[in-house]
């Protein structure tokens, strides 16, 4: 029946999953907080002309609506834009970096046959006002630490650079339209299509080899030397940036979790430098991503370098293999005669840190069905008190 249906892509979070999400969220936010990032909240609704236009999410994925004044609003499609807006308008007035954290849901319309959620929660951090490679390393190390704190140890963070492929494409192709075609193949990870398209281009065998060699630039720091052989002079500084980043991440103790992927292309068009994606060993999709976006705050009238990341709670739960949390609550069931004693007992147990449901016997139709979901049950009925352990 229609009354039980939900809008496409929207999902209910029932108690077991809610508890699992709460536990994972807490492990992430606890570590981000310990690194000195201050948490903030932004409105679910933003103006389309500000956050909506500046978002890197495709237009057809935005949820739009009109307010009473006829202005177009959007449900926030990501958190980077809203935090950039806040930082530009209210917070970035000091001559030192700003560290902001968040835990919030974002909204992106999905195709009906895709089966993907249109609403999902992200936990993340943004470092605004620091353009150094150390800042890039900090947010990557923080993302790695947060994942470990959540209990995930088998993961990789693939690191690339938004400008590296572009440098090669512009030098070899000299045409933005041609470059966009190759960039799309990389974004879709359609490497077969990429190779076939490169072979069809009217280029010298040397230039074709350079474009094809880009696909092989994955691995440790050693691939930077290979990159220097195919990237032109203008791209050498980008390669040096990646080498410096690797050295800093080694100091953080993150080397085992990182690898370079120099043909990485992101769907987030505002990235201007280092970018990265997080993969878990047992799932086949990205569970988090981030990167540097030095131009975004300028669109809000306060230019500043920035970098950050977001981790998806739903995908992290799947990567962790967490089952829905079962209730750890106790139940206290009472009759009228011992109501006062039952209330006192329940309050004492709660003060000790237990979760306690207090239930009048008169409100229960099937006592066996109700009590089987509780860890322990204590009865205050008639003249007696009786305990039943789960």
UniProtKB/Swiss-Prot annotation:
Q: Which GO terms describe its molecular function?
A: catalytic activity, acting on a protein; histidine-tRNA ligase activity; transferase activity
Q: Which InterPro entries match?
A: aa-tRNA-synth_II (IPR006195), aa-tRNA-synth_II/BPL/LPL (IPR045864), HisRS-like_core (IPR041715), HisRS/HisZ (IPR004516), HisZ (IPR004517), HisZ-C (IPR053846)
- Report if keyword Nucleotide-binding is assigned: no
Q: Is Cytoplasm there in the keyword field?
A: yes
Q: What is its main location?
A: cytoplasm
Gene3D superfamilies per the UniProt record, alphabetical:
3.40.50.12590, Bira Bifunctional Protein, Domain 2 (3.30.930.10)
This protein's pathway reads:
Amino-acid biosynthesis; L-histidine biosynthesis; L-histidine from 5-phospho-alpha-D-ribose 1-diphosphate: step 1/9
What PROSITE patterns does this protein map onto? AA_TRNA_LIGASE_II (PS50862)
Which keywords does the record carry?
Amino-acid biosynthesis, Cytoplasm, Histidine biosynthesis
- Show the CDD domains listed in the entry: HisRS-like_core (cd00773)
What Pfam families does its record include?
HisZ-like, tRNA-synt_His
* Gene Ontology, cellular component aspect: cytoplasm
A biological process from GO? histidyl-tRNA aminoacylation
Membrane-spanning residues:
none
Anything else of interest in the record? This function is generally fulfilled by the C-terminal part of HisG, which is missing in some bacteria such as this one.
State the function annotated in the UniProt record: Required for the first step of histidine biosynthesis. May allow the feedback regulation of ATP phosphoribosyltransferase activity by histidine.
The UniProt entry, under PANTHER family, shows:
HISTIDINE--TRNA LIGASE, MITOCHONDRIAL-RELATED, HISTIDYL-TRNA SYNTHETASE
> Tell me, how does this one assemble?
Heteromultimer composed of HisG and HisZ subunits.
Return the similarity comment: Belongs to the class-II aminoacyl-tRNA synthetase family. HisZ subfamily.
Q: What is this protein called?
A: ATP phosphoribosyltransferase regulatory subunit
Q: Organism source for this protein?
A: Bacillus velezensis (strain DSM 23117 / BGSC 10A6 / LMG 26770 / FZB42) (Bacillus amyloliquefaciens subsp. plantarum)
Q: What is the lineage of its organism?
A: Bacteria, Bacillati, Bacillota, Bacilli, Bacillales
Q: Which gene encodes it?
A: hisZ
